[in-house]
Structure formats: structure tokens, C-alpha cells
Amino acid sequence: MPRCRRCTLRVLLTNDDGIDAPGLEALRSTVEYAFGDELERVYTLAPDCQRSECGHGVSSGKPLRIVETGSSAWSASGTPADCVRFALTSLCPDVDLVFSGINAGANLGTDLMVSGTFAAAREAHNRGVPAIAISHYRRPDVPRTWQHTPTWLASTLRDLLARIGRGEGRLWNINLPAIDPDSLSPGSIPPAVFCPVDRTPIPLAYLPATVAGELDIQTARDFYVESDFHNRPRQPGSDIDVCFGGKISISLAEQY
């Protein structure tokens, strides 16, 4: 439980895109910008490689390799959930808050069931530490920049810390919209909206790797999954609707 905003904070940063991902550096810059001198120490423990869509998988039956990569920073050979488990039991059990992200791509609606980014936050919450998962919706037609994340997120993160301190929720999911910061007027920030997590499943189609000949379910075949992420169905006012509509979505996600 964070002590208070007038006191110092110890935080853990993690992600599912890996220790070298630009979104992790953006997360560190964002947290430092939002909390400044209130930070006592920032720990980082993230997977040593890309672990997107690994869900809440954990490693068992094999060693977890931890490598120091910098000041108060380490990589792990496991999943995002492994990182949080190790950190909260063996590395920094006294942290006040866990941040996971910033994911290069949205984690909205039922995506939370497979998101490694959100699983890391959920693991922290399950172990009694409040957590915030952060993702950034991306589109092919919008530049993939990170420099704007501190100004876009600072107010929201401070607000959520205050809510956590008041007992108004301890597991939050944030998604930034796919907007070119340069398209906004100077100093403008997309509005932040509190909204529920959409429970509408994304439609899927499994297509054979080769369509020649008849499908024989008795024979091994390769299939590709196809979905239309950007045009997925959504409920009005849900996290998908809010984020795809150009606003910052903020969802209390303890039910996940």
C-alpha cells in the first residue's frame, strides 16, 4: 500500500516486450516525470526477450536466470508474471507499486486474458501490491513515438495513486490512443475517461496454411488465426470504444 504522496515511493517496472523495449524506457521516464522526488527507488525486472501474448504463464521445472543489466535493473529468462513473482519475493519485496508497460499495442477488452503486460500487473495485485498496466494503441498510419507518454500520463498516474491510497481500486489498466502527438495543438492531451472493460470477444477465423485440396481433420495441418483488431466489435462507452475513439481509457480491472 503506498504510504502517501508526500512520502517516498518504491516502485517496480516490468513489461512483456522485453528489457530492451523502448516502451520500458518510456515507462521509466513517465514514472519519473509523474512522481519526481517522491520516488525513493525504481527497480526494473523484465523478460530477456519478447514475451507478448504469453498470458499469465509461469516457469516451472527449470531455473529462472536473472541477469543484472544496469543500476537497479535486471532481466529474467521467464515471463512477465515470473518477473513480478521473483521481484516481490526475492528482489524488492517492499515495493509500494508495480507498473507494467508501456506495451507497444493496445490491451483492451478480452485481450486482458492473454496479455503478458496485464498478467504482470495482475500477479502483483494477487500478491497484495497495487499495480497499473499501461499500453499504447498503435495503427499503421500513425507514427510510433514515445516522447509524449510522460505528459499524456502524468496526471492520470498521480490520480490513480491517490485512488489506490483511498482504497478505490488496486488494479488498473490504461490504454493510450493511436494519435500522432504532432497533430494536436501545443500542450493538448487526449482526454482520459474511466470506463468498463469490454467483454465482447474478438471474432476469429482459422485459415489453413494451404487451401489446396480437401481438409482432412485426421491429418496434421497448419492453420493461421485471422482477426480484424482495428474494426473489432465493441460496446458503447467501453475501454475499446473509448481508446479507439481517440481518448485515454482507464479501467478498474480487479475482476480479471
Model-derived features: where do they sit?
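Short acidic, Gly/Ser-rich segments with clustered Asp/Glu that frequently serve as metal-coordination loops
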Residues: 17-25, 226
